[in-house]
């Protein structure tokens, strides 16, 4: 499965954990969850992306095996911010005889680590392109 998203996420200094962002595609849904209720300066914060797919659809692991393309994540961040990840869980085997691929059916949860600089604005934006 290959799809593109352009997502603009506005995060505030006091970001509430109950506030999530959801994006729907034709066969998948992305939910974004912050780790805690605040994004602090000079810290590491976990931003989790949950990808849910329709029955019969899947997405590939970082090493997709015999066929498919791995998910790639490109972030546009404010100056001084750094994003690493995702931290990949172990994949499922997805057989396409005679080929074997690796990925995720139904759902995958991918944590990213957002490192903030010593001084951050009260409001900032992150842009994610998921290919």
Task: Give the label of every model feature segment.
Residues 4-14:
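Sec-dependent N-terminal signal peptides
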Residues 18-129:
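Extracellular/lumen-exposed scaffold segments
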């Amino acid at each position: 499965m290959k799809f593109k998203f352009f997502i603009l996420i506005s995060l505030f200094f006091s970001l509430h954990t109950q506030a999530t962002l959801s994006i729907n595609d034709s066969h998948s849904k992305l939910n974004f969850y912050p780790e805690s209720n605040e994004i602090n300066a000079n810290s590491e914060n976990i931003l989790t992306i949950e990808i849910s797919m329709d029955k019969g659809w899947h997405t590939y692991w970082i090493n997709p095996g015999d066929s498919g393309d791995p998910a790639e994540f490109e972030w546009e961040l404010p100056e001084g911010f750094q994003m690493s990840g995702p931290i990949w869980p172990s994949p499922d085997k997805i057989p396409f005889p005679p080929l074997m691929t690796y990925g995720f059916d139904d759902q995958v949860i991918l944590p990213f680590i957002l490192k903030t600089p010593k001084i951050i604005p009260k409001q900032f934006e992150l842009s994610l392109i998921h290919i």
